[in-house]
Amino acid sequence: MPDSGSLGPPTSLPEQPPAPPATAPDAPAATVTDRPVTSSVAHFLAGLHPPVTRPSSPPSPSMPPASSNPSSPPSSSMPPASWAPPSPLSPPAPSLPPTSPPATAPETSAATGSDSVVRRVPVGPTGLGTTALSLARRQAAVPPDAVPAPSGPSAEGPVVPGLYHHPIPEPDPVRVAEVSRRIKRWAEDEVRLYPEEWEGQFDGFSVGRYMVACHPDAPTVDHLMLATRLMVAENAVDDCYCEDHGGSPVGLGGRLLLAHTALDHLHTTAEYAPEWSESLGSDAPRRAYRSAMDHFVRAATPSQADRYRHDMARLHLGYLAEAAWAETGHVPEVCEYLAMRQFNNFRPCPTITDTVGGYELPADLHARPDMQRVIALAGNATTIVNDLYSYTKELDSPGRHLNLPVVIAEREHLSDRDAYLKAVEVHNELMHAFEAAAAELAADCPVPAVLRFLRGVAAWVDGNHDWHRTNTYRYSLPDFW
């Protein structure tokens, strides 16, 4: 997703963003002391993952599928009738009219019936100044027979044998088609992201399916587009600065710093500001960052936008560590690699789930150490998923690419197969730790905004795995089974 020429005026107007939530200052985290939590850890986890039938992959010969682990709840279990999720809230009333989509793409409805995860997620604003932090409003849990089965055949793609994961319903095809149409128009007309010869790679990215799967509670396609533009922009920076299309570790720090100013603007003197502003249009990654962030800040609160900027700084720091190792030919220890991957990972994507969902997790609740642990574990687990599914793709690419199986094989003197299987075990342990930490936080702080955010992060983790599994254009599994 690279540069296709110098910046010029866009040939089409961008879609109108969803109305921003209220921008009241952050308040102290809510304290709940008088309402006991009735759901157990297992019940909370079961409520995150409605049952979905998928064809199963053959088990690994050296270890049983992780879903059989007795210490974790099965992904197909349902919460008992006594467990009630937070009640749905009224959807926000936008102060700006949404973009009128084609007749086939509903804009103002919540996720369709196929997005059954959203049936357990309250919709509407939960920002400051609303009633979202009230714990009095509850409703009965949706009974299992009220959850519609996914419509249509599931996309094909094998699951890594032994990988602990949760299947998801098929993403709404109407939303997928509309997001795909809009993001391609944005990439080609507004930011001119790639030359014509790279169009097939952009289409093969399947970002529309990706974002619809990861954000089942997004109230409109406009909200989905917030995440989709940012995802495409992040990948443009990775591809053009670090990886496939002209990327190099040499000079990466300077390129990343200047690109980051498209997210976190330079404040300087009148003499030098015009030159900086002009630089934001000098290449495709910066054009994409600038446009995607402009859309995002119009819909997000100031604290949500600042949260995203900090998470992107973390990502760029991880890029620089990996680049430094590439320049010197250093293969890190496994713990060093995992530390790098805690920064060079998907964290900026799930942590905008509240903005995409049309509500806000207040800054004080986001900053809680237990919430930060949940977010870190989710990002780490999803990033190892990427290592596992992109393993053969990276082996076939020029140069040496570090991923967890490669580092384990090198540092622990294991065969490629045994190292890959151990990486699966690392992923599974991270996933179990993420789910346990999320359940503990839900029990300790059962505030509706917290519960919804946790469900949003879990949905992103599941959708991210499903996209890797189904994207056979990009990924294939090694022949280890």
UniProtKB/Swiss-Prot annotation:
Listed binding positions for Mg(2+) are 238-239, 243, 386, 390, 394
- A Pfam family annotated for this chain is Terpene_syn_C_2
Q: Where is the composition biased (Pro residues)?
A: 11-23, 52-64, 71-104
User: Has UniProt tagged this entry with the keyword Secreted?
Assistant: no
Note the InterPro entries from the entry. Answer: Isoprenoid_synthase_dom_sf, MIB_synthase, Terpene_cyclase-like_2
Q: Which UniProt keywords apply?
A: Lyase, Magnesium, Metal-binding, Plasmid
- What residue spans carry the Low complexity bias annotation? 24-33, 105-114
Biological processes, Gene Ontology terms:
terpene metabolic process
- The EC number(s) attached to this protein equal 4.2.3.118
User: Region (Disordered): which ranges?
Assistant: 1-125, 139-160
Any GO molecular function: metal ion binding
Q: Which reaction does it catalyse?
A: (E)-2-methylgeranyl diphosphate + H2O = 2-methylisoborneol + diphosphate
Q: Which cofactors are required for activity?
A: Mg(2+)
Question: Gene3D superfamilies per the record?
Answer: Farnesyl Diphosphate Synthase
- What family is reported? Belongs to the terpene synthase family. 2-methylisoborneol synthase subfamily.
Q: What does this protein do?
A: Catalyzes the cyclization of 2-methylgeranyl diphosphate (2-MeGPP) to 2-methylisoborneol (2-MIB), which likely involves the intermediacy of 2-methyllinalyl diphosphate.
Q: What else is known?
A: 2-MIB is a volatile organic compound that has an unusually low odor threshold. Together with geosmin, methylisoborneol is responsible for the characteristic smell of moist soil as well as unpleasant taste and odor episodes associated with public water supplies and contamination of various foodstuffs, including fish, wine, and beer.
Its protein name is: 2-methylisoborneol synthase
